[in-house]
Amino acid sequence: MNLNFMPLLHAYNHASIDFHFNSSARDFCVHEVPLYEFSNTGEHAVIQVRKSGLSTLEMLQIFSQILGVRIAELGYAGLKDKNALTTQFISLPKKYAPLLEKNTSNFQEKNLKILSLNYHHNKIKLGHLKGNRFFMRFKKMTPLNAQKTKQVLEQIAQFGMPNYFGSQRFGKFNDNHQEGLKILQNQTKFAHQKLNAFLISSYQSYLFNALLSKRLEISKIISAFSVKENLEFFKQKNLSVDSDTLKTLKNQAHPFKILEGDVMCHYPYGKFFDALELEKEGERFLKKEVAPTGLLDGKKALYAKNLSLEIEKEFQHNLLSSHAKTLGSRRFFWVFVENVTSQYVKEKAQFELGFYLPKGSYASALLKEIKHEKGENNDEF
């Protein structure tokens, strides 16, 4: 497989929309939504922190320096953008809580502000978040492009969007996935095991994005062409599908087609199951009750079946499935964007957008779908 970055297909077919977006504290805000309510009792203080111009790891370093707490004692649910105004929850041993208020000015000097203090019985761990609320401000937006953007947002609010990994997974030079493959091939290795694991996960992410783009291509072909033309297409690709199945696929109202053997999952979380009744699962997908998942290949990965597996095989890799420390998993192919709000400020030529995404989904994927700009792999959030 070609490891150079290829353009990823969009879900919708509108022309590109021209505007300017700058990932900055003024124009990009991220607010973490916790996975559970905090009990207000327990041995761990839980603080909500607002930061600007700092990565999460830089923020943790500041807390360690000011409070004298070891970084290993600090808990956080996920990494938040540096070039944004963000809020997130941090846990630390209860004994450090009295030092928080005493050091308010020291935190403010570092662009940190503690918004709330609570307590809980366990440390916050990676993944302990429900999702994130986002705010984005687009500039140099004409009234016509604002109208186009609203129309695109209506489609996205109705059907959702592709759950592509954002380019921060792939590094400044878009080559992390190549380094990950070299590690799997024993051509290179780094001293820090976490770095090795991250680079391997970048390769998984690259394959996932490529598979998702391929599935979008197939969905578009099914929708655009007749059953007879589709039969010829699938025959040329050596994919097994009959005319009755193609009729069922064409009748699915959602732009992303559910194929026989897809690994589905109840949305936004739940158990995996195989898509066997295509009409039924297509309707449930349209109602946002379930969603199809894509492969993150690894030793214990769950694989698709039937037609879905025939397509997925191209994006499997025996070095991933045999790598002892790469277990593998599934990731939603598709996510539903919630609480979409927008406002066009004509006198400033600015468009303000608010929305919610579940954990693991990227605001850059939404920006990509709105903007339809070539070379979107340069996004940084």
UniProtKB/Swiss-Prot annotation:
GO terms for cellular component: cytosol. Belongs to the pseudouridine synthase TruD family. Keywords: Isomerase, tRNA processing. The active site is at D81. Signal peptide: none annotated. GO terms for biological process: pseudouridine synthesis; tRNA pseudouridine synthesis. InterPro entries: PsdUridine_synth_cat_dom_sf, PsdUridine_synth_TruD, PsdUridine_synth_TruD_CS, PsdUridine_synth_TruD_insert, TruD_catalytic, TruD_pseudoU_synthase. The gene is truD. Residues 160-335 form the TRUD domain. It catalyses: uridine(13) in tRNA = pseudouridine(13) in tRNA. Its EC number is 5.4.99.27. PANTHER family: TRNA PSEUDOURIDINE SYNTHASE D (PTHR47811:SF1). This is tRNA pseudouridine synthase D. SUPFAM superfamilies: Pseudouridine synthase. One of its GO terms (molecular function) is tRNA pseudouridine(13) synthase activity. Responsible for synthesis of pseudouridine from uracil-13 in transfer RNAs.
